[in-house]
Amino acid sequence: MTNHKLIEAVTKSQLRTDLPSFRPGDTLRVHVRIIEGTRERIQVFEGIVIKRRGGGVSETFTVRKISSGVGVERTFPLHTPKIEKIEVKRRGKVRRAKLYYLRSLRGKAARIQEIR
């Protein structure tokens, strides 16, 4: 087995198949498993996907939300076991792959049109 085929086989076994398809502009609820000392709990992070990057095991996505008037962005590895589940709340209609322009918009200007 060549190195490339070996890497491909290991990568394929690590990919998650239970996640829904989503794109930048979609509103997600990401359920993240958090371990604090000996306790474990689920924390929900809800916001708009502003980017997806990479491929295979190293693929990541960034979710942005406004919390107490402050913009919070969190980047998650897509295939990590720390993600319990992902719910797609809304499908957004955007014409860009990276929605960095949302960082400078406030209030109603930062809304994204929904796909029906």
Curated annotation (Swiss-Prot):
One of its GO terms (biological process) is translation. GO terms for cellular component: cytosolic large ribosomal subunit. SUPFAM superfamilies: Translation proteins SH3-like domain. Pfam families: Ribosomal_L19. PROSITE patterns: RIBOSOMAL_L19 (PS01015). Keywords: Ribonucleoprotein, Ribosomal protein. GO terms for molecular function: structural constituent of ribosome. Belongs to the bacterial ribosomal protein bL19 family. This protein is located at the 30S-50S ribosomal subunit interface and may play a role in the structure and function of the aminoacyl-tRNA binding site. HAMAP family: Ribosomal_bL19. This is Large ribosomal subunit protein bL19. It comes from Staphylococcus aureus (strain JH9). The lineage of its organism: Bacteria, Bacillati, Bacillota, Bacilli, Bacillales. The gene is rplS.
